[in-house]
């Protein structure tokens, strides 16, 4: 018996996720929130001026969701992005890597024309 996979017809109102929040990143954030002992915490990802390439990424925990925040949930973890940062992060991937160089959150951003060697700074 042959099976043929058919692509689902996308809903015209369907909007792609603004960014990818990997399982690895969500699981690490969940672990950090559990260590803090405050289940109300959410991970806020933001872009601000600075760094050697003009913009830099930032991460912080926040209990509050602002009116202009975009919210994503993965594996029970909420990710917040403010409206200014959102425009720079659309299409990006937030991951958590552990390797010989250590452990860190990594953002792969298709909007960045150049990135710094440290990986936390970029320009558009």
Swiss-Prot record:
GO terms for molecular function: 2 iron, 2 sulfur cluster binding; 4 iron, 4 sulfur cluster binding; iron ion binding. The keyword Glycoprotein does not apply. Pfam families: Fe-S_biosyn. GO terms for biological process: iron-sulfur cluster assembly. Transmembrane segments: none annotated. Its cofactor is iron-sulfur cluster. Gene3D superfamilies: HesB-like domain. The keyword S-adenosyl-L-methionine does not apply. Binds 1 iron-sulfur cluster per subunit. Iron-sulfur cluster binds at residues 52, 116, 118. PROSITE patterns: HESB (PS01152). Keywords: Iron, Iron-sulfur, Metal-binding. InterPro entries: FeS_biogenesis, FeS_cluster_insertion, FeS_cluster_insertion_CS, FeS_cluster_insertion_RrpA, HesB-like_dom_sf. Homodimer. Required for insertion of 4Fe-4S clusters. Belongs to the HesB/IscA family. This is Putative iron-sulfur cluster insertion protein ErpA. It comes from Ralstonia pickettii (strain 12J).
